[in-house]
């Protein structure tokens, strides 16, 4: 896509999704330092610290759909457990397969794997548990969503040793979403969004 934001809006219209003002910050961070020349479609790393009624899982699922409906894309949903990652995975499955009728080339609810063969190549979305870091090694990712990331044990290690390297080759994006929980690694990442280029953070 020439412009991710253009396609994103087309997709939101297609699925009849109208984000509220807080969700818009996740989908399209403010212009300026968060939209560098190397990444005109927005911040690569977004940290959203939001309450339980925000709809963060739903908005993250919309981001996943935007990516996985393009050819040759890889999306991971990483959470403290498979039970947690299943929530966003299920939202995506229900929208693409149940509501829109797209036919997956492979689907496993147990393994949380969903693949599509598009005209330009295969794309995949899968749910993963941070309890099993060995499962976070391998293919390059276009998008990684870290759900309830403040509750991921050893988040710093998981991010730096496993997830961040998977984003390098494709210049992939990461979205950290979580409810507030102390001043650990999630809070440190939140502060990066206030000070570092290509990072953006907000709370709601």
Where are these regions (language model features)?
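Phosphate/NTP-binding elements of NTP-utilizing enzymes
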Residues: 1-204
């Amino acid at each position: 896509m020439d412009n991710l934001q253009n396609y994103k809006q087309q997709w939101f219209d297609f699925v009849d999704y109208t984000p509220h003002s807080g969700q818009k910050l996740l989908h399209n961070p403010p212009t300026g330092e968060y939209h560098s020349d190397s990444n005109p479609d927005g911040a690569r790393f977004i940290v959203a610290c939001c309450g339980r009624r925000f709809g963060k899982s739903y908005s993250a699922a919309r981001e996943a759909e935007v990516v996985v409906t393009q050819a040759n894309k890889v999306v991971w949903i990483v959470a403290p457990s498979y039970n947690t990652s299943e929530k966003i995975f299920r939202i995506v499955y229900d929208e693409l397969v149940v509501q829109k009728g797209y036919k997956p080339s492979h689907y496993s609810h147990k393994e949380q794997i969903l693949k599509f063969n598009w005209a330009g190549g295969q794309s995949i979305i899968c749910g993963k548990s941070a309890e099993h870091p060995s499962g976070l090694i391998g293919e390059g990712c276009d998008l990684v969503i870290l759900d309830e990331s403040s509750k991921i044990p050893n988040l710093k290690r998981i991010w730096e040793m496993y997830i961040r390297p998977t984003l390098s080759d494709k210049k992939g994006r990461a979205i950290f979403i979580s409810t507030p929980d102390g001043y650990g690694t999630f809070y440190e990442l939140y502060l990066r969004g206030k000070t570092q280029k290509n990072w953006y953070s907000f709370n709601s």
